[in-house]
Amino acid sequence: MTDLPFSSPAVVPQESVDTDDHALRFGGIRRLYGTRAVERFRTAHVVVVGVGGVGSWTVEALARSGIGKLTLIDLDDVCVSNVNRQLHALDGTIGRPKVEVLAERCRAIQPGIEVVEDIAFATPTNLAERIPEDADHLVDAIDSVVAKAALISWCKRRK
């Protein structure tokens, strides 16, 4: 049987092998969106408010897209009742803060990521102290309708 050129790693010239860890991890993102987008993702700061059912999946998708900095805001701990819908809910994570568990997952996916863990609820009265000034984007994954409405209003006033 003849070896095909792509069947053996020895066929690839050493100088063409990319040794930059970020480039290796996020090469698929570069192929889809281009180099400028990858660099923009790498320097972006995204805040996710609420890291439960919607937020946990969002956080992982952002980390897997090469986002450089995440701020995670939530006061809840992982509960056994979260197992059916929340990414971070596993036997070994029950009882731990959700933001802490997700921060660990993000660092395992992307070792160079910066994750700010804010173990607190976002409320109408504390948004200014919770949401960082340098945030580029904000994801609303809040359960509380009152807090959600306050966050929307706060964001509209800010930008």
Where does each model-flagged region fall?
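Glycine-rich phosphate-binding loop
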Residues: D134-K159
